[in-house]
Amino acid sequence: MKKLSILGVTGSIGTQALDVIKKSNGELKLIGATANSSVNKMIEIIEEFNPKYVGMMDKNSADKLEKYCKERNKQTIVLSQMEGLNKIASLEEIDIVLTSLVGMIGLEPTLEAIKAKKDIALANKETLVVAGELVMSEAKKNNVKILPVDSEHSAIYQSLRGNDLKTLNKIILTASGGPFRGKKLCDLNDIGVDDALNHPKWNMGRKISIDSATLMNKGLEVIEAHWLFNCDYDNIQVVIHPQSVVHSMVEYCDGSIIAQLGAADMRLPIQYAFNYTERKNLIAKTLDFYEVAQLTFEKPDLETFKPLKLAFKAGKQGGLMPTILNGANEAAVALFLDEKIEFLDIFNIIENCMNTFEEETKKPLTLENIIELDKKVKKYVVDMK
């Protein structure tokens, strides 16, 4: 039996991970789980999965949950805030941690888990975007596996299995193109929140849905792929694939291309990471090629969807520039979701921040500098609104 902690258990990835655990015939067990403030959802999880530990980032929510557990004589231990997240990420009795928190908040507990020598099922892409060098170095030092949960990176991981990385020629990351595929800049002036959240293929959380609409999600995945697979940015290609059947591809030095195909179901890469490459039965819809009918591929429009272009630029510059990119994007997306800025303002804010904070990139890449700069960039974005 494999014992797990899930950071961000009430979100989209966390919820689907629970379904994987439920269908594992007792081979997977939830030991620790964290959420931000969703008390009612966490109560349901306690009742169904009986985790030994739960953590809430919001202290008031933790107090409510603790009261619930005491009144019903539940043995679940309730922890709170970042200290609680870090403890649940590094529990002695667990084997693997799923980090499915959204944003920079996932960095610190991920590092704590790695230091505790826990394998990481990584769904929090921002961790590698801002601190890829630190995370991969720490993972190597502690002999920890970083197992990708993003469908694209899981596809690459699977396509690389059994082959020498030295023979890798190119990584081809596929993207659905989001809800605005084919549109030009002038078509994006009056985009509302509901329009941007309406992803054609994937059922995702609000923040990642907006990132998919701007193509920033693919930009973050480019940086993530660079660190996961030690691949130069010039050898990472993004291809628009609206059917979302080919999850990504790998081109080898002889020109051969290996791809991973499957239904658009996040439970597949989650289960693959949990079982560390061992194939297990999963009751899910499989791919029917008669239904698919055709597979098409297009070049991304980098002039319209500038965030993807900016992500390549930030990744190539390295150091603290990806922290600026990510912090500006997180803050801008939050403002857009609150209907305080327009859709295209997200693009302009990211570029503005990359120019404004250029001098900050001369500082060394440390955890302290990453956290400090992230706060500084986000405050700047909120203040400029």
From Swiss-Prot:
Describe the function of this protein: Catalyzes the NADPH-dependent rearrangement and reduction of 1-deoxy-D-xylulose-5-phosphate (DXP) to 2-C-methyl-D-erythritol 4-phosphate (MEP).
UniProt cross-references to PANTHER family, sorted A to Z:
1-DEOXY-D-XYLULOSE 5-PHOSPHATE REDUCTOISOMERASE, 1-DEOXY-D-XYLULOSE 5-PHOSPHATE REDUCTOISOMERASE, CHLOROPLASTIC
- Which Pfam family, any one of them, does this sequence belong to? DXP_redisom_C
Binding-site residues for Mn(2+), renumbered to this chain:
150, 152, 221
Residues the entry annotates as binding 1-deoxy-D-xylulose 5-phosphate:
125, 151-152, 176, 199, 212, 217-218, 221
A biological process (GO) of this protein is: isopentenyl diphosphate biosynthetic process, methylerythritol 4-phosphate pathway involved in terpenoid biosynthetic process
Protein family membership:
Belongs to the DXR family.
EC class of the enzyme, as a word: oxidoreductase
Instruction: List, alphabetically, the InterPro entries matched.
Output: DXP_reductoisomerase, DXP_reductoisomerase_C, DXP_reductoisomerase_N, DXPR_C, DXPR_C_sf, NAD(P)-bd_dom_sf
Q: Which reaction does it catalyse?
A: 2-C-methyl-D-erythritol 4-phosphate + NADP(+) = 1-deoxy-D-xylulose 5-phosphate + NADPH + H(+)
Q: Where does NADPH bind?
A: 10-13, 124, 126, 205
The lineage, from the top, is:
Bacteria, Bacillati, Bacillota, Clostridia, Eubacteriales
What UniProt keywords are attached to this protein's entry?
Isoprene biosynthesis, Manganese, Metal-binding, NADP, Oxidoreductase
| Entry-linked SUPFAM superfamilies | 1-deoxy-D-xylulose-5-phosphate reductoisomerase, C-terminal domain (SSF69055), Glyceraldehyde-3-phosphate dehydrogenase-like, C-terminal domain (SSF55347), NAD(P)-binding Rossmann-fold domains (SSF51735)
Cofactor field: Mg(2+); Mn(2+)
For this protein, what is the EC number? 1.1.1.267
What Gene Ontology molecular-function terms does this entry list?
1-deoxy-D-xylulose-5-phosphate reductoisomerase activity; manganese ion binding; NADPH binding
Report which superkingdom the organism of origin falls in. Bacteria
Pathway it acts in? Isoprenoid biosynthesis; isopentenyl diphosphate biosynthesis via DXP pathway; isopentenyl diphosphate from 1-deoxy-D-xylulose 5-phosphate: step 1/6
| The protein's name | 1-deoxy-D-xylulose 5-phosphate reductoisomerase
Q: Which NCBIfam families match?
A: Dxr (TIGR00243), PRK12464.1 (NF009114)
